[in-house]
Amino acid sequence: ELYPQKPVILLAFDESEIKQLPEEFQKSSIDSVFIWSGNANVLLAIVKLLEDKMNIKRDIKKADVRCIILIEDSPRYYSLILPMIYKEISHQVKEMVDKSASDHERLLYMRGRPRILLARSYEEAERYFKRFRMSTLGIISDIRFPKKDKLDKNAGVKFARWARSIDPSIPIMLQSKHNK
């Protein structure tokens, strides 16, 4: 514990590698787990996600940036979707910037891109929404994820109802890899 403020990320080849680690090691030593799928963009997404989480308060206060809350507990799925979300945000910001803008202006626009906050449980998503509601552009949520430390097959629907009771106009996209 020489550097307690430094995040520790586990980049695993598949979920079986994670299961081989002792549970107490996973909870005490590892901040985030990602799954390698052969897409090098996951490395950039990991860095951006960490920067977003570390800088969100300051960025909202100083630059009035917005955020998107992603609720997903599956390392495999968020390892796939985060690079796509960051790529799409980057594309949209570039499209928004006037072609006649200087390099400096383009850089300022890119720094103002929406931040992504990854929540892996109902309670974490609730904390993010309560804290950053006025700066939240929208919510992307899985249907099934932990609530009160137990997998809840309707947590996404419950969270959407709760968020809409606070802000009826908040955009919410529910998605699931499960058929039912």
What kind of feature is each model-predicted range?
Residues E1, P114, S141-K148:
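Residue immediately C-terminal to the conserved phosphorylatable aspartate in receiver
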Residues E1, Q5-P22, D31-S37, E72, ...:
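A short, hydrophobic beta-strand element within the central beta-sheet of small alpha/beta folds
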Residues M96-G138:
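Acidic, metal-coordinating helix/loop segments flanking the phosphotransfer/catalytic sites
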Residues S121, D149-K158:
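Acidic catalytic/metal-coordinating carboxylates
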Residues N55-A63, L107-L108:
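Short boundary motifs at domain starts and secondary-structure transition points
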Residues Q20-Q26, L82-Y86, K180:
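Short, aromatic/basic amphipathic alpha-helical patches
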Residues V65-R76, I81-E105, I116-L118:
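Conserved acidic segment of CheY-like receiver
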